[in-house]
Amino acid sequence: MKHVAVLGGGPAGSHAAECMARAGLRVTLLDEKLAWEKPCGGGITFKAYDKYPFLRDNGAPKQFVHQTWLGAHGAGRVKMDLNQPLIIYSRRDLNQLLLDRAERAGAQLEKTRVLGFERLEHGWDIRTREGVLRADFCVVATGARNPLREAGTAWKPADTMVALGYFVDSRQEHIDIQFLEELEGYIWVFPRSGHLSVGICGKGESARQLRARLERYMEQNGIPIKDSRFYAHVLPSLERQSWRDNRVSGDGWLAVGDSAGFVDPITGEGLYYAIRSGDLAAQCVLDETTAPEAKPAAYRALTDRDFARDLYLGSMIARNVYMGRFLFDTVPARMIHFIRRSPRFRALMQDLFAGTQDYETLRERLFRNLNGTLQEVMLSFFCRRVVPELSNP
């Protein structure tokens, strides 16, 4: 394999291009915009920067956040310190960081729009505005709105969620997360370098309904809408059956990041999975022990073992996390109560924010700690409400 074309220059495509170019392959990365400000919170978890330290150790503008406030209807708000900080980037700055790394590794970057591609007996003809590029193999990294319907995940409307919001000229040091009544989604306020990203993501409601919810929240919390720049985007949020049928690879191509549907169905977080899938795609392409015709199956097996099975498990519980009930209240409200009163549950939530708690072992951990959590909640309630002087020795 002599020449690989990477179709898309977001985090997934950029990192795949870097890894392959660094190993000596000829790599051409094609993207219409290259670095641009994508509507996204821009959060990098400990799980991501622990595996890929360059996400932490670089000169790009970024914000280290050590504290979050979480709220839910009927439960108020609670402060939670993060054991491991979240790193928040402007997506333009993050994309530029990754593109620069790819270019330094030897990848050729071309700012052009991919109009389509055609499978040949040996390789691909890729049509762009400037002409036709021939490549031996393709890595598809064209994002959630993938225009290349022949490759990448083939999702249905139910497999997406709307994300929209505002870039606000304001500052704060912490993250805000607000769960809303009857919504499979949440509002976020992320501090970036120089501004806030204030947004909402959710399933089952129109963009107009979500925008109304967000603007009501902003007005209630004194966050200015006037002169703030609006953004909107579609995120993959695959349903359970769609994970089973997900099309992540095919004859001569591998899909990475959003174009493969690799986004957490509960949190909407996709940056770790973008970079990780780019890494795994590069490993698969570079593996000389795997024949070209066997690479699609090998890549699917790699992603399944590494993270895709866990995302599938997340899709099985996503609706209950937002819309379910537990102990006569909503699950989000109970989460707030438990964070406030139970050190065990608070530690679990800190691990979820760090990305170190997977969904496969989440149920077991919850049930293993349930008795202790409830005891802590009751003891906290007793000390603070029944005998308040005990909580203030």
Q: Where are each of the predicted segments found?
A:
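Beta1/beta-strand and adjacent pyrophosphate-binding region of the FAD-binding site
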Residues: 1-12
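Conserved hydrophobic helix-helix packing surfaces used for dimerization/oligomerization
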Residues: 4-6, 27, 253
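Glycine-rich FAD pyrophosphate-binding loop
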Residues: 21-40
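A conserved beta-strand/loop capping segment in the N-terminal third of enzymes
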Residues: 44-97
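FAD/FMN-dependent oxidoreductases across multiple families
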Residues: 116, 206-285, 289-297
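C-terminal helical "tail/cap" subdomain of flavin- and related membrane-associated enzymes
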Residues: 283-393
